[in-house]
Amino acid sequence: MRIAILSQGPELYSTKRLVEAAQLRGHEVHVINPLECYMNINMRQSSIHIGGRELPTFDAVIPRIGASITFYGSAVLRQFEMMGVYALNDSVGISRSRDKLRSMQLMSRRGIGLPITGFANKPSDIPDLIDMVGGAPLVIKLLEGTQGIGVVLAETRKAAESVIEAFMGLKANIMVQEYIKEANGADIRCFVLGDKVIAAMKRQAMPGEFRSNLHRGGTASLVKLTPEERSVAIRAAKTMGLNVAGVDLLRSNHGPVIMEVNSSPGLEGIEGATTKDVAGAIIEFVEKNVTKVKKVTQAQG
C-alpha cells in the first residue's frame, strides 16, 4: 500500500514509529505536512498539491494533526476522504474530539461517566456555576488547551471566582469541572484501536502537581484495567467516531469518569510503559480496513 501520514513533525517519535512499522510490513510511506498542502476542489477531479505538484494516489491516510492546526488539517484530511482514500480517523471524528465541550455533551447523552461539568457566559452566573459542580476545590479548563496547558485547580471558592472571572474577561472559552480528589493526581490512558483497548498506562503527577500529563513531568507505569474501564473507554472512542483514540479516565468513588478523548494519541509513553508494538498494531488495523472503504466516503463535512 501507499500510505500518507499527515504530520508536521517527521522527527517526532510517533511519526517515526508509524513510518518504521509500515515499512517493515512492505508499505510505501510519505510523511506530509498538512500546512504545505493546498487543494483543488471541483466536481470532476479534486486533488491535493504541494509545491506546484499534485500528490500521487494514496490507499490510506493516517492523520497526526496537532490541535493548533485542527481547522486546516481537518480540511486537508477531508479532501483525502472525498477522493476515496481510507482515513484511519476521519475529519468528523477529529473535529468532534477537539471540541472539549461538544465531547462532554455527546458522551453525557450516551450515559458515559463524566466529572460534573459546567459552562457559562456571564460573570453573574459564576456563583451558581461553582455550586453546580460541587463547590471548591474545582478544575477550570480552557476549551482550546492541550497537554495540561490552560488547566487550573482552584482550591478555594474565592480563587475559583477570581480565575473564572479573569478568563471570562479575556473572552476565553472555559469549562468548570468537579475535582476528583480520590484520583490522587493519577489518571489512566487507554489506547483504543477499533473495538479493543490494546494498551493502557497509569500516569502519576509529580508531587505538588495535579496534572498527570507526561509533558508536565508525570510518570507512566503499567496498569490493569477493570472490565468497566475497558468498556467505557471503547464507548467513548466510538461516541467520537474514532478508530484510534487515547481515552483518559479517572478512578472516582462512583466509577470511571472520562476526562478527554484524544484523536492523535502519542505513542512514546504508551509503548515505553507497556513495551507493546502499538505502531505495528495500527498499521495492521489499516491493512485490514482499507479494503472496506467506499468510493464515496461517509464524511459529512
From Swiss-Prot:
For ATP, which residues are the binding ones?
141, 178-179, 187, 211-213
Keyword field contains ATP-binding: yes
Looking at the UniProt record for this protein, which Gene Ontology cellular component terms does it annotate, in alphabetical order?
A: cytoplasm
Q: Which UniProt keywords apply?
A: ATP-binding, Ligase, Magnesium, Manganese, Metal-binding, Nucleotide-binding, Protein biosynthesis
All copies of the ATP-grasp domain together span 104-287
Which residues hold Mg(2+) 1?
A: 248, 260
Q: Which cofactor does it need?
A: Mg(2+); Mn(2+)
Q: In this record, what's one Pfam family?
A: Rimk_N
Cofactor binding remark = Binds 2 magnesium or manganese ions per subunit.
Q: Any keyword ATP-binding?
A: yes
Q: Which domain of life is it from?
A: Bacteria
Binding of Mn(2+) 2, residues: 260, 262
Enzyme Commission designation? 6.3.2.-
Q: Kindly list the positions annotated as binding Mg(2+) 2.
A: 260, 262
HAMAP family xrefs: RimK
Similarity section: Belongs to the RimK family.
The protein's name in its UniProt record: Probable alpha-L-glutamate ligase 2
Source species:
Shewanella sp. (strain W3-18-1)
